């Protein structure tokens, strides 16, 4: 299978998000990369489903709560920027203060 670097990145984010979901199911708090991956995957999949940018920017801030991440992680993540493919092209989506 020949994948472009962009496709490899998307696959890696998707896999990291799957690991994060499993850890949350077990009650394990997420670390920095897991939290970023979960939020990023939410945005990428939402874009694929055709949800508008503004909706994803708002909804992305409700994917993870402070009680689901390790201490100090919420303060480390101020913005998450994801380049996602929408039906009308690729756009940069920024989720501000994603862990509340």
From Swiss-Prot:
Q: Which reaction does it catalyse?
A: urea + 2 H2O + H(+) = hydrogencarbonate + 2 NH4(+)
> Which EC numbers characterise this protein's activity in its record?
3.5.1.5
InterPro entries for this protein: Urease_gamma, Urease_gamma/gamma-beta_su, Urease_gamma_sf, Urease_subunit
List all membrane-crossing ranges.
Answer: none
Q: Where in the cell is it found?
A: Cytoplasm
Give a GO biological-process term.
urea catabolic process
Q: Which UniProt keywords are listed?
A: Cytoplasm, Hydrolase
- Give the pathway: Nitrogen metabolism; urea degradation; CO(2) and NH(3) from urea (urease route): step 1/1
Task: Provide a GO CC annotation, any one.
Answer: cytoplasm
Q: Which GO terms describe its molecular function?
A: nickel cation binding; urease activity
CDD domains (UniProt xref): Urease_gamma (cd00390)
Q: Keyword Protein biosynthesis, does the record have it?
A: no
Cited HAMAP family? Urease_gamma (MF_00739)
By sequence similarity, the record places it as follows: Belongs to the urease gamma subunit family.
Q: How does it assemble?
A: Heterotrimer of UreA (gamma), UreB (beta) and UreC (alpha) subunits. Three heterotrimers associate to form the active enzyme.
Protein name as annotated: Urease subunit gamma
């Amino acid at each position: 299978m020949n994948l472009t670097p962009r496709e490899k990145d998307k696959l890696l984010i998707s896999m990291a998000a799957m690991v994060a979901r499993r850890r949350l199911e077990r009650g394990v708090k997420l670390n920095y990369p897991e939290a970023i991956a979960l939020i990023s995957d939410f945005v990428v999949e939402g874009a694929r489903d055709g949800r508008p940018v503004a909706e994803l920017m708002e909804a992305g801030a409700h994917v993870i709560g402070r009680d689901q991440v390790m201490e100090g992680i919420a303060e480390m993540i101020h913005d998450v920027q994801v380049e996602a493919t929408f039906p009308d092209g690729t756009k940069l989506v920024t989720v501000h203060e994603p862990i509340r």
